[in-house]
A protein has these predicted regions:
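Catalytic phosphate-handling regions of large nucleic-acid enzymes and associated NTPases
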Residues: 1-215
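Short, intrinsically disordered, charge-balanced linker/junction segments flanking boundaries
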Residues: 215-221
């Protein structure tokens, strides 16, 4: 090869670019919930798919998984697991059948045996075509919401856990009524106290919680 055709290629620059692209994809498109609506992409796509076919009746979870696969490119198992976890929190999804129990660790029945529909709360607070920004789905056949216009701090109600690339999130769940009271206090510009709470009950020591700021500690059992 002549000297004129030789070219220096800096591999470290390429790896840095590839890593940043991969990290951004995993964190934004899979692992970490968005602070605005409190949802990971798979959760958002599940709720959107349920809204598209909602007629007020229960639908088999196996059917809902299939509907969501039109928007989510990562397979039925991840969709089914995410749907069950949303349903077990008894806020956004109205369930029917054996959905397992987070207190005992019992798993849900197979998707063909359990049913679900959006809860009245979800229908009232989470959807508005006029205030929703849309994007095309991964295959360009459907449109899906970039974010859901949820009128409630769902991220705090559900809590969140996700491990991305160089980034991790762990947010404890909070009490529904206390979140409503805190939201009203914010609107009225009043002070309030808000601490984590759990559907399973228990005891919590918030002496060093520091309002949830970095460095704060909380003990639960």
């Amino acid at each position: 090869m002549s000297d004129n055709l030789k070219e220096t290629l800096h591999v470290d620059d390429l790896y840095e670019k590839w890593f940043l692209e991969y990290a951004s994809y995993v964190n934004l498109d899979r692992a970490i919930p968005h602070i605005h609506d409190g949802l990971k992409p798979v959760q958002r796509r599940i709720l959107h798919a349920m809204k598209v076919q909602d007629d007020g009746r229960y639908t088999k979870v196996a059917n809902l998984i299939g509907q969501t696969m039109q928007y989510h490119p990562h397979g039925d198992a991840s969709i089914g697991d995410a749907l069950v976890k949303i349903g077990q929190k008894e806020l956004m999804i109205d369930t029917q059948g054996n959905w397992g129990d987070i207190r005992t660790g019992d798993v849900a029945a197979a998707p063909r045996y359990i049913e679900a529909r959006l809860s009245p709360f979800a229908l009232a607070t989470s959807f508005d075509d006029e205030t929703t920004d849309w994007q095309m789905s991964y295959d360009g056949r459907k449109r899906e919401p970039i974010l859901l216009p949820i009128k409630f701090p769902l991220l705090l109600a559900h809590g969140a856990e996700g491990i991305g690339v160089g980034l991790r999130t762990y947010i404890l769940p909070h009490n529904f009524i206390e979140l409503c009271q805190a939201s009203i206090a914010i609107i009225k510009k009043k002070s309030f106290e808000l601490y984590p709470d759990f559907l399973t009950g228990g005891f919590v020591d918030v002496q060093n919680y520091q309002d949830g700021l970095q460095g704060g500690k909380i003990k639960c059992r």
